[in-house]
Amino acid sequence: MPFVVVITGIPGVGKSTITRLALQRTRAKFRVVNFGDIMFQEAVKAGWVSHRDEVRKLSLKVQRELQLKAAQRILEISQKEPVLLDTHATIKTPLGYMLGFPREVIEVINPRFMVIIEANPSEILGRRLRDLKRDRDVETEDQIQRHQDLNRAATISYAMHSNALIKIIENHEDKGLEEAVNELVKILDLAVNEDA
């Protein structure tokens, strides 16, 4: 039976770092799949983009097509091994925010658990400014908070369509990365035990 745990958070929240460190400590065995990477691979194959950050600037129709292709690939993988899906619940596009999982996509992936990583907007802004590898939009702290609020709302909607459980993990500078990683390890261990 397919088994997917979604981990989401807005760019700069520390989602990928927390995921990487948690997987080194958990007893559970997951294959990490990045939803955006699969969309990017499909877009490159089609000749639409050459850089990952260009995907979110494609037309909504093309992005939705890429989302569905990615979902189908993830389903195939999850039928063979548990998947930890690193993704975004909402994507900021030039026209507004797009759902990371439209109904037809969430129904294909059908996750068991959804983990949201959050932080204070000032922390996220600082992390984004230090990350020179990515072409990130410049946003105010208010815009960052709005994006996090949209992520929560979207994740609740996804859970309604998949019956997934939701967990929010805070990744604050003062709280420490270690605590956030430990929380994710607990969730991953419980998720696999819950499925057994």
From Swiss-Prot:
Catalytic activity: AMP + ATP = 2 ADP
One GO cellular component term noted in the UniProt record for this chain: cytoplasm
Enzyme Commission number(s): 2.7.4.3
InterPro entries assigned: Adenylate_kinase_AdkA (IPR023477), P-loop_NTPase (IPR027417)
Annotated ATP binding sites: G9, I10, P11, G12, V13, G14, K15, S16, T17
Leader sequence segment: none
Molecular-function GO terms, alphabetical: adenylate kinase activity; ATP binding
Cellular compartment(s): Cytoplasm
Keywords: ATP-binding, Cytoplasm, Kinase, Nucleotide-binding, Transferase
Enzyme superclass (EC): transferase
Keyword Ribosomal protein: no
Domain of life where this protein originates: Archaea
NCBIfam families noted in UniProt: PRK04040.1
Family to which this protein belongs: Belongs to the archaeal adenylate kinase family.
Name of the featured protein: Adenylate kinase
Source organism of the structure: Thermococcus sibiricus (strain DSM 12597 / MM 739)
Gene name of the record: adkA
